[in-house]
Amino acid sequence: MHGLAGALVVIAMAGGLTVEQDRQLGDHVRLVVGPMNGAVIEQDGRRLVVYGAPADKVRTAERVLFTHARRDVAEAGRALVERGAVAVAPAAEEAFFHEPRRFWEDWPQKRFYDFEQQTTKILTEPIPVGRTVKGGDVLDWRGLAIEVVDTPGYTRGAVSYIVTVDGVRYGFVGDVIYGQGHLLDLYSLQDAVPDARIGHYHGWAGRMGELITSLRTLRSKGLDVMVPARGPVIHRPVEAIDTLIARLQAVYRNYLSVSAGRWYFREGYDTLARRVLGEDPDVPWMAQAEHVARPPAWVVPIHNSRLLLGESGRGFLIDCGGKAIVEEVRRLNEGGTLRGLDGLFITHYHSDHTDAVEELLEQFDVPVYAVRPLDDILARPGAYRLPVIARPPLRNLRIVDDGHGMPWDGLRLTFRDFPGQTIYHSALLAERNGERILFVGDSFTPTGMDDYCLQNRNLLHEGLGYLYCLDAVRGLPAG
């Protein structure tokens, strides 16, 4: 499994991306290489181009076929369209060609509280589309019948184009595959899965099911050659598709087996498994860890926050993401259960853990503790592009180093860097009368690790990310 998973994604670094050379694929089909592959079909002295081509290699064409609207691919065809070529694009993504400015006008605010986590690789200037297409359409160009196939996955509305030229059946497949069984990236598959009742943020590789369906559709088309938007031309399509599907399924099976989400969405995770792995998914689910139904009396659960009570009745709050939390703290304070608040600890920057901090500070002017990797993102959230980041900067910040400890009202508090759910994440070890509790924010549940969203940068590598967190837990004193 590890070998399959490790070979799935192309590493975009020196030596990681295979660069093709310009060459003839057939008597009437030529590969032209630029930032993206360009496929040039010539008939009757005229040209049709798929994807695009550098201006110094192809000056004009009658049509340019776009497989999807991602900027890194679509820009390759812009110059040809500006010189008169008719742009053909998927109907489902037409708005990204026609109205990209609307996306960017909304972006300065939409990037906060961003649960959808879709790509920002959107065109910055429009490309006029002369014709839109969808699966089942057939384009007639100079005697060639070009079949349009819906192939969502890498993007929601992508299409592929299939045509036979000189007896060779070509598939121009965009980014559904790279080389002999790879994928350019997993980040682009993030999406909601409505039939599993999984929202965008929790939809880790949510379009993997659609991608596999698209790959199987292409497999059934009897292709001789696949020309993706980038990377090497694929001359053994069936083998490449089967390899990629096996790798995708291996990665997804591994992901599901240790996902924290199963604790919250058990039935939904069964649905996720069937969508990608089939009716008998055989996921080696991690055994559920023991969990404590009721914490000790000095820990008061308040929604997704925890209020620590000291020996004198003073309080120390962990996270504050909603008004209901502030209202409950105020109620406890007014009722005498709580005798004032001494501090607030932030585990991570997500809005459901920080949104009500300012409201809390208006009523309890306390220091806001955070471990050093969080200092900048809490003070300058607008400088970051990360999921569900809250807009307002936090004030009253008191930044401490990893491992910093302090006594507080009969407890010992130790602050830890804990880059689990997201790279900017912390934990708090609280000790009282021999009881030790590590508050880990959203990093773990009894079913595994909280890895819903690839853009959180939850890393898996020796000494980093979740493995660093597990090492930290192993190093805790027994108790």
Predicted regions and their residues:
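Active-site HxH/HxHxD metal-binding segment of metal-dependent hydrolases
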Residues: V29, P54-V138, A324, L332-P407
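Binuclear metal-ion centers of metallo-dependent hydrolases, dominated by the metallo-beta-lactamase
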Residues: G231-V283
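Conserved beta-strand hairpin/beta-sheet module of binuclear metal-dependent hydrolase folds
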Residues: V19-K57, S160-G174, Y178-G179, W285-E334, ...
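Active-site-proximal loop/helix segment associated with metal-binding centers of metalloenzymes
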Residues: R101-V129, V176-H200, D242-L256, G382, ...
